[in-house]
């Protein structure tokens, strides 16, 4: 082998993995599916915003067993880095269900629907007693809306019976200072 000057150190040169955590994002798609029961599932896709550069995370690298661990400085402290590398990545959210006519005592089934879309800035009307009147959210209502999303790693079994993992949005939180993207800003991000 011919020696050269190039080196590679996984701790400093390795790629940055997707990390669980909370990130600023925007809704870029909404797909709904109605079931025979009358319930509808709302599936959103979120795109991590450029503002993620202001989010600090612990730098990770692959260890010898193929899992990730924190990169430590010379004092043994975890090294922080910007999450800017997450900007532009898209993640599916866990589906949000709307049950238009829940059985008596099962109105709780619509809590996640109300919370998720309220956290996106959707205002549902309330009567004088404070009871919320739900409405079916449409794509134009949510596209481009800002949120802080929590990414978690989920395990699943694929159709071949193999264990896999994927990152999904499991919580949608308000992003008070976030700005809604226009349809043009969302369309500019389409790669074709």
Language-model features, listed with the residues they occupy:
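Short beta-rich binding modules
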Residues: 1-192
